[in-house]
Amino acid sequence: MSARETKRLQTRERLLGAATAEFKRTGMAQADVGAIVAAAGVAHGTFFFHFPTKEHVLLELEKREEDRMAKHFGRYLDKGHDLESALTEAVRLVLGLERRLGELLFKDFLALHFSQTRPASEGGSDHSLVLLLGQRIEQAQAAGEVDPEVRPINSAVFFLLGIYALAITTNDPMRCELLEDLVKRTMHSMAVIA
């Protein structure tokens, strides 16, 4: 890698860090690009060179967070945990993301995640957490633990959508119980019908 490329990547990282901090503080819509570039120590136009819009910052953050969660989830699955434990771990990972991002940024993150007007991401997005959970459901299906008519990837999507919805719409006293029930109901919905 050339010195120029190294410097470009370092600048992008500084901008991403400064933007993430500003988004946590104010939310994406209210974030001030001037404050972001001042914190990163770069010219105003440099932000738009690296990130054409503030939404592009969230896309980069989304990719990194999904990759991080998928790596952790993959290591967890490699230890041979059962399906119910895997679903519970997925809940834990999403709630951990909320703690790391903070309430404002987490809501922006999910709003962009499901937005029909979201910008196209550069490398595409394979939603690796969904794929890993779908594969785990498929393994349970092959072992006779999940109904043969269940579509594993659809069940993974439905489950994760449920987590996201409950995470942004419920408060702490109710949330734990609702998420535990989501795991139970998901297991019940996939059970082999005798």
Task: Label the model's feature ranges.
Residues M1-T26, Q30-A39, H56:
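Basic, helix-initiating cap at the start of DNA-binding domains
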Residues S2, E89-G96, V130-L131, Q135-A143, ...:
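C-terminal peripheral helix-coil segments that are non-catalytic and often amphipathic
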Residues S85, S121-D126, A142-F158, M174-L178:
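All-alpha amphipathic helical-bundle segments outside canonical DNA-binding/catalytic cores
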Residues G41-F51:
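Short hydrophobic/aromatic patch on the recognition helix
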Residues E60, G74-L101, F159:
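Hydrophobic alpha-helical connector segments
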Residues L95-G134, I168:
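Short secondary-structure transition hinges
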Residues T11, E65, M69, L87-A90, ...:
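Hydrophobic/aromatic residues within well-ordered alpha-helical segments
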Residues F51, L58-E65:
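Alpha-helical DNA-contacting segments of helix-turn-helix folds
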